[in-house]
């Protein structure tokens, strides 16, 4: 791995905008992949700076959202653990998507990871599934 890669997870990489989240889940252009216990919902969007205020505020090529439903884990401690595992796995392997998007100028990805299982998994298993999903997404771009 080149030394120039930064394995950080900054605020700009988080999907926080209600408008973009609605576009991802309600809009009909998103795609979904599953690798149990995770499901990835993603949407490839154009970055158009001429739109002004209506343009998505994307300073990074990928924005992610992590969701662990209360239906699966009643205790917040367990939900937070799973979210932390997913964020860490993304942070360590985000170059899979970033390298692919550097080839396609003007494109951005909105990505949501949704937990599907009622059981906790170890970090290595979660990282393997996140990596698998990101590789499959990069192949479909």
In which residue ranges do the predicted regions lie?
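Positively charged, solvent-exposed patches that mediate nucleic-acid binding
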Residues: 1-141
